[in-house]
């Protein structure tokens, strides 16, 4: 149905007592209403002038009776449409059959249009609201783009840094690019990132020329980077992010608070110094004590073991505040000395190594008690084990195993040792070193 300028639709039902056809119904509508009203409301004239639309009839013949649904579009006003609807109910015959006509509804088509307009306007407005960017977001977006543009690169390593890194008298050394960006958001532009735990040479040289603050994450990784910086760079102040947080995820208020609370490096050294020019790590005190497992106490005499392990504890648990090469040389010398005494000190380990060889199992000592498991079972229960006196595995010792166990045991023995970085408080031995 083409509604066009239609305002109302008249819905009508017709029941005829006999068989009639559609053209009989149309003829009855025009024939029986003709002359009832003035010429202004004559159906034929109204249809010719377009003030009423095409009359639509749906007809069914059931058990000798005819049922019709009639729709008549009207663009007349309310009064004229009501009169026209009432006129249709005067039809009492269709062809030769008696008939009854009843108006079921007069629909104001403009109501449905208004409802459509309301619903559509609501959806359009919602879309506009979703796409609209408020002033704050526009401002932040512009600032963010400027900060990203402000990130520069320093040195041959192309390290991310702030724009004031060259001209500022003081600098802040952070871990990565995200840290530099977060500090730029807070208006701090004299930052540079080391991009990893290995400190680039350009950072080492830069810290000698400028007042340097090391600003690291408040987690284990931050501690390791800080130790590396203290070993290799000329650090003046130390600042840490809140415990468990990273610099890149810290709010402006917290960042400024952490930087204001920075402490001189001498205070860090003083709090952790043993009086011989070395800085001890922040590991628990029990790790600094002699690390001889209880399992081996009966094998070795106290007079021989005690001085050897005290020396190891000092050398292995500390960070030398000297150039890296010298520190590495000193640690290697201690290990070499230990290797010459390995047969004497670890005679009891041979039995453990022999017991797990070619089995794929692991053996560890907890409170003087030996336990044997498959490696899978050991990993399942690792969270229940806080401290071990000793750990041996019939498999190569990888960096992952070292990272998992370095804070649980002082000694790890395996088929072979394949690690790139060894914690200073950990002793690593291969089967060949133990059996030799």
From Swiss-Prot:
SMART domains: TOPRIM. GO terms for biological process: DNA replication, synthesis of primer. Its EC number is 2.7.7.101. GO terms for cellular component: cytoplasm; DNA-directed RNA polymerase complex; exosome (RNase complex); primosome complex. Pfam families: Toprim_4. It comes from the Archaea. Transmembrane segments: none annotated. Its cofactor is Mg(2+). GO terms for molecular function: DNA-directed RNA polymerase activity; metal ion binding; poly(A) binding. The keyword Transferase applies. Mg(2+) 2 binds at residues 217, 219. InterPro entries: DnaG_primase, Primase_DnaG_arc, TOPRIM_DnaG/twinkle, TOPRIM_dom. Keywords: DNA replication, DNA-directed RNA polymerase, Magnesium, Metal-binding, Nucleotidyltransferase, Primosome, Transcription, Transferase. Residues 169-243 form the Toprim domain. It catalyses: ssDNA + n NTP = ssDNA/pppN(pN)n-1 hybrid + (n-1) diphosphate. Gene3D superfamilies: 3.40.1360.10. Forms a ternary complex with MCM helicase and DNA. Belongs to the archaeal DnaG primase family. This is DNA primase DnaG. It comes from Methanococcus maripaludis (strain DSM 14266 / JCM 13030 / NBRC 101832 / S2 / LL). The gene is dnaG.
